[in-house]
């Protein structure tokens, strides 16, 4: 899969940088991998539920070419002080501390483990536009970028679903974050102006046209420093697993996503612990909320959809406890503004971004009003971007 793009200022600058770092630009190929927003369905993916994400036009660009030896050479425009990171193909099992090169090593390990032959080194220059710790999936964007780079350079013909699953495996088994498949799936399967309703239990999915009429999706970035591995992500994963285990003593279920709200409420005594009940209630209620939200979205009932965004945020705040001052200030201030149908945090939480459904004509006033309140409460500014929904990870044919 590839898309034709014009040689933009960004690509020209990256081409020059590639020549500066690696000597010339012979046989260089171009690639792009998006970030993602999740419209609704948060922390449901690893609980066997539904998610409703879309890939966005902010992402990670890569320039790559094969080498004739065994060396892998990497350079990131985002971390120029690191210079060129170099390792041997025989050394991919050994992690590089906390460096971004681990995502490259992880994808090599997973592809080779799946039986694909990666028998030469390569050079890769990347530039990520996704703000670090924004909750817009910079890590999954990089994993899938590396996936499409290796797939193309080594002519592997990896089925897209397998590539997505290997991206998740890299995150889980190499990096050590117990994430579900939401991020990699959204980034691997994204299409222009379409969201994806994905059942994370079966991996059945439906592409849903994004028809917002006079509304925009505004991304609001807290700009709070955050590392996913330092957040309570793995803790929430463990808590919902424990709640499921306790419910399985009586109920024949494989995941919390199989339960209706009523079935869950009737069996909370099986869990016993109040904190675990809250965690599991979010997973169950959010999953059912997502199914209703998608139907409202398709029917063009954006008012109902917005109300469900608000309910999602409240559940993430009160039951799942993954929001915090910054995200609550953004989402709750946004919900009070003129022209706003709904707002909620998106991504893992603990920082990162929130989204709001805002009338197009109100966006400027909205950003000003929410920005002022946020800076007053938190002490530093938020950033705002209107989301454009674009294609998934792909090779670029540059004209």
UniProtKB/Swiss-Prot annotation:
Residues binding substrate, per UniProt: 42-45, 233
Any GO MF annotation of the entry: magnesium ion binding
Reaction(s) this enzyme catalyzes, per UniProt: alpha-D-galactose + ATP = alpha-D-galactose 1-phosphate + ADP + H(+)
Location within or outside the cell: Cytoplasm
PROSITE patterns named in the record: GALACTOKINASE, GHMP_KINASES_ATP
Pathway(s) it belongs to: Carbohydrate metabolism; galactose metabolism
Gene3D superfamilies per UniProt: 3.30.230.10, GHMP kinase, C-terminal domain
Residue numbers annotated as active site: 183 (proton acceptor)
Major localization class: cytoplasm
Binding site for Mg(2+): 139, 171
Pfam families named among the record's database cross-references: GalKase_gal_bdg, GHMP_kinases_C, GHMP_kinases_N
Record-annotated site: Transition state stabilizer: 36
GO annotation (BP), single: galactose metabolic process
First-level EC class: transferase
EC number per UniProt: 2.7.1.6
Entry similarity comment: Belongs to the GHMP kinase family. GalK subfamily.
UniProt-recorded name of the protein: Galactokinase
Organism: Lactococcus lactis subsp. cremoris (strain MG1363)
């Amino acid at each position: 899969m590839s898309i034709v793009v014009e040689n933009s200022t960004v690509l020209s600058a990256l081409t020059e940088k590639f020549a500066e770092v690696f000597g010339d630009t012979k046989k260089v190929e171009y690639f792009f991998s998006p970030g993602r927003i999740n419209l609704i369905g948060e922390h449901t993916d690893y609980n066997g539920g539904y998610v409703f994400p879309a890939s966005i036009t902010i992402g990670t660009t890569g320039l790559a070419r094969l080498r004739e030896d065994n060396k892998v050479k990497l350079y990131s425009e985002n971390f120029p002080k690191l210079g060129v990171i170099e390792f041997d193909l025989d050394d991919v099992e050994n992690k590089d501390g906390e460096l971004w090169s681990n995502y490259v090593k992880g994808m090599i390990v997973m592809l080779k483990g799946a039986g694909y032959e990666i028998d030469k080194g390569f050079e890769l220059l990347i530039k990520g536009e996704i703000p670090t710790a924004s909750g817009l999936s910079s890590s999954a964007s990089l994993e899938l970028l590396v996936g499409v780079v290796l797939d193309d350079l080594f002519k592997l013909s990896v089925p897209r679903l397998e590539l997505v699953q290997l991206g998740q495996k890299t995150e889980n088994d190499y990096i050590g974050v117990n994430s579900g498949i939401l991020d990699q799936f959204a980034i691997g399967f994204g299409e222009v102006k379409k969201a994806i309703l994905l059942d994370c239990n079966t991996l059945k999915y439906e592409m849903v046209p994004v028809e917002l009429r006079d509304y925009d999706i505004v991304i609001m970035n807290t700009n709070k420093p955050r590392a996913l591995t330092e957040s309570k992500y793995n803790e929430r994963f463990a808590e919902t697993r424990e709640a499921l285990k306790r419910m399985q003593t009586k109920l024949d279920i494989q995941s919390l996503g199989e339960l209706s709200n009523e079935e869950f409420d009737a069996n909370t005594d099986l869990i016993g612990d109040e904190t675990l009940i809250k965690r599991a209630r979010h997973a169950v209620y959010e999953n059912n909320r997502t199914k209703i939200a998608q139907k409202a979205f398709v029917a063009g009932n954006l008012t109902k959809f917005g109300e469900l965004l608000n309910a999602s945020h409240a559940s993430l705040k009160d039951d799942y406890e993954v929001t915090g001052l910054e995200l609550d200030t953004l989402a709750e201030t946004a919900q009070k503004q003129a022209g706003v149908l709904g707002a909620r945090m998106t991504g893992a939480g603990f920082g990162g971004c929130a989204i709001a459904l805002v009338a197009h004509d109100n966006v400027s006033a909205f950003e000003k009003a929410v920005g002022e309140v946020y800076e007053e409460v938190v002490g530093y500014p938020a950033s705002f971007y209107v989301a454009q929904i674009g294609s998934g990870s792909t090779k670029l044919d540059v004209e």
